[in-house]
From Swiss-Prot:
Attaches a formyl group to the free amino group of methionyl-tRNA(fMet). The formyl group appears to play a dual role in the initiator identity of N-formylmethionyl-tRNA by promoting its recognition by IF2 and preventing the misappropriation of this tRNA by the elongation apparatus. (6S)-5,6,7,8-tetrahydrofolate binds at S114, L115, L116, P117. Transmembrane segments: none annotated. It is an enzyme of class 2 (transferase). It catalyses: L-methionyl-tRNA(fMet) + (6R)-10-formyltetrahydrofolate = N-formyl-L-methionyl-tRNA(fMet) + (6S)-5,6,7,8-tetrahydrofolate + H(+). It comes from Phocaeicola vulgatus (strain ATCC 8482 / DSM 1447 / JCM 5826 / CCUG 4940 / NBRC 14291 / NCTC 11154) (Bacteroides vulgatus). One of its GO terms (molecular function) is methionyl-tRNA formyltransferase activity. This is Methionyl-tRNA formyltransferase. Signal peptide: none annotated. SUPFAM superfamilies: FMT C-terminal domain-like, Formyltransferase.
Length: 324
């Protein structure tokens, strides 16, 4: 079979999914349909509809687009079936019902942003950085009933530097993911795929780390942890959705403070956890049990994101100021 004869349906929504679709199109594959989320109401009163990044790219390429509200809707199922896909590819989309992923003769594969079986779930990149991992990766695997558990097709390992935040790791994986999707389709086309069950990669001593969805309360900083854990937590949520805390000032008021970039300072001290140390010009540090978190970039509620020097120009300190 030639590339142009392989009928592919692609499913994805955010920026992360655009690169893989782009590689398929530029690689000469026949993408007969793109499934993405419905346009999102934006602006005042939801008067403006914002298409997904995948839709924007698909429109620019003249690809056929389907935007179902419900993936089990009979009209959508019939339209999807009419595309006569040989293969479906899923990148950062939704959980698919079996009637959808079982439809094409060559199956449906997913690109997942971790080295499966580690970090099954919705936020694998965040959790790898939060946990201080020095390596992550991307995996292509065939879908089956249980989420993120199907047989592995291919994997690529990617280092995580100590200074990488989640945005940097996201972008590394996004571009390498495009390569891996293309390599996986090539392998399926030439019949060289030998899928590996995830169970065969799990040893008795293996600790499987989950990657659950991240909510606002997940992002609250626990200052009772150590310097390294807090540092990794902040970069694992930067720039989005952003780690946050409450800044408590002398008059008893509290303000939500998002923290984007920090440095580790290991030191002995006699300050209380959460107390603030600052010269009011160049540094703003939070005391933790084994040192300080030196805050470099931050944002008060209702204000723009700024560096610490700009923040300190408008900041008033007292002995009672702290974060918690």
């Amino acid at each position: 079979m030639e590339k142009k004869d392989l009928r592919i349906v692609y499913m994805g929504t955010p920026d992360f999914a655009v690169e893989s679709l782009k590689r398929l199109v530029e690689g000469g594959y026949n993408v007969v349909g793109v499934i993405t989320m419905p346009d999102k109401p934006m602006g005042r009163h939801g008067s403006v509809l914002q298409p997904s990044p995948v839709k924007e790219y698909a429109v620019s390429q003249g690809l056929r687009i389907l935007q179902p509200e419900k993936l089990k809707d009979e009209a959508f199922i019939e339209e999807l079936r009419s595309l006569q896909a040989d293969l479906q590819i899923v990148v950062a989309f939704r959980m698919l019902p079996e009637i959808v992923w079982n439809m094409p003769r060559l199956g449906t594969f997913n690109l997942h942003a971790s080295l499966l079986p580690q970090y099954r779930g919705a936020a694998p990149i965040n959790w790898a950085v939060i946990n201080g991992d020095t390596e992550t990766g991307i995996t292509t695997f065939f879908l089956k009933h249980e989420i993120d558990t199907g047989e592995i097709i291919q994997q690529v390992r990617v280092p995580i530097a100590d200074t990488d935040n989640v945005e940097i790791v996201h972008d590394k994986l996004m571009y390498l993911g495009g390569d891996l999707v293309l390599e996986t389709v090539d392998a399926i086309l030439n019949g060289s795929v030998k899928p590996v069950p995830q169970e065969s990669l799990i040893r008795q001593e293996t600790e499987l780390r989950p990657a659950p969805k991240i909510f606002k309360e997940t992002c609250r900083i626990d200052w009772n942890k150590g310097v390294k854990q807090i540092y990794d937590f902040i970069r694992g949520l930067s720039p989005y959705p952003a780690a946050w805390t409450e800044l408590c000032v002398a008059d008893g008021t509290r303000q939500v403070l998002k923290i984007y970039e920090t440095e580790k300072v290991f030191a002995s001290h006699e300050m209380n956890i959460g107390d603030i140390r600052t010269d009011m010009k160049t540094y703003f540090q939070v005391a933790v049990k084994d040192g300080f978190i030196n805050v470099l970039t931050l944002q008060l509620a209702g204000k723009k994101r700024m560096n610490v020097a700009d923040f300190l120009r408008g900041y008033r300190t007292s002995d009672n100021n702290k974060v918690e």
